[in-house]
From Swiss-Prot:
Keywords carried by this UniProt record: Endonuclease, Hydrolase, Nuclease, RNA-binding, tRNA processing
Chain spans, region Disordered: 39-59
Phylogenetic lineage: Bacteria, Bacillati, Actinomycetota, Actinomycetes, Micromonosporales
Catalytic activity: Endonucleolytic cleavage of RNA, removing 5'-extranucleotides from tRNA precursor
Species for this entry: Salinispora tropica (strain ATCC BAA-916 / DSM 44818 / JCM 13857 / NBRC 105044 / CNB-440)
Domain of life: Bacteria
Gene: rnpA
Name of the molecule in the record: Ribonuclease P protein component
Homology family: Belongs to the RnpA family.
Length: 136
């Protein structure tokens, strides 16, 4: 189980991570990763140096999106539990203050635990990698 400080619970937190983070899809998961310092803190009137210090001292946080397309409530909760357990093992490897949203695609219900882990690892690694230039 993730601690309360490690969970995303407000819709504004989810929206900020999805809109401002890097989106990478691998297999049956789509990961939205926001690293510290990439999102401006518009709700604070403090100087920028103070907000940056607060962001980096906060733990990495994670949230999950499992839609009804994945299955009924039993299936969705099973997928969410497996993803939560996988993310709990990987969260300490993310920089402090980062935000991770994991979205399960409909075929995630039929994936094994090991395969979900492989997909999640690949997506997180791709999201953390520096952006390369695209050739046209």
């Amino acid at each position: 189980m993730l601690t309360a400080a490690q969970r995303l619970r407000r819709s504004t937190d989810f929206a900020a991570a999805v809109r401002g983070g890097r989106r990478v899809g691998r297999g049956v998961v789509v990961v939205h990763l926001t690293l510290p310092g990439t999102l401006p803190d518009v709700s604070s009137s403090k100087p920028a140096r103070d907000t940056g210090a607060e962001q980096t001292s906060a733990p990495a946080r994670a949230g999950f999106v499992v839609s009804k397309a994945v299955g009924n409530a039993v299936v969705r909760n099973a997928v969410r539990r497996r993803l939560r357990h996988l993310v709990r093992e990987r969260l300490p490897g993310l920089p402090a203050g980062s935000t991770l949203v994991v979205r399960a695609l409909p075929t995630a219900a039929h994936r094994s635990y090991q395969r979900l882990g492989v997909d999640l690892d690949a997506a997180i690694a791709a999201a953390r990698a520096p952006r390369g230039r695209r050739s046209r």
